[in-house]
Amino acid sequence: MPRRREVPKRVVLPDPKYKEEVIAKFANVMMRDGKKSTAEKIVYGALEMVAERSKSDALEIFRKAIDNVRPVVEVKSRRVGGATYQVPVEIRSDRRMALAMRWLRDSARKRNEKSMGNRLAAEILEAAENRGNAVRKREETHRMAEANKAFAHFRW
């Protein structure tokens, strides 16, 4: 974090196929070793599979999945008088989106399907139905915040 001035946010250009910033951002999250075209192929393939399996708009299902995974509160560690407390704090909207995408990617990577496209498609479909590991991760985060609600007055 620079001290002098705030660093401007980079503008993410919409993806070429769906003309959506969300998809472009997700492709960037999926990218490994700077291989953007590979990441885009995986994301587009997964979205096609989602459309095939659900017989409806893949983009809508993807948005619903992201919304279901997006957390509202998280806990941050705060030292107060020698003790470390897990203080629940509300999450900024851009961080909510970033966390949701990261959790979706990580849960897809942990699955056992053959290709990454299959894994991602399955995870997106489950997340859209409020199931799956990514949704479980959000629930866990909310549970932690709820359990530590007593320390909310330590917020900074």
UniProtKB/Swiss-Prot annotation:
InterPro entries: Ribosomal_uS7 (IPR000235), Ribosomal_uS7_bac/org-type (IPR005717), Ribosomal_uS7_CS (IPR020606), Ribosomal_uS7_dom (IPR023798), Ribosomal_uS7_dom_sf (IPR036823). GO terms for biological process: translation. Keywords: Ribonucleoprotein, Ribosomal protein, RNA-binding, rRNA-binding, tRNA-binding. GO terms for molecular function: rRNA binding; structural constituent of ribosome; tRNA binding. Belongs to the universal ribosomal protein uS7 family. Part of the 30S ribosomal subunit. Contacts proteins S9 and S11. This is Small ribosomal subunit protein uS7. It comes from Acidithiobacillus ferrooxidans (strain ATCC 23270 / DSM 14882 / CIP 104768 / NCIMB 8455) (Ferrobacillus ferrooxidans (strain ATCC 23270)). The gene is rpsG.
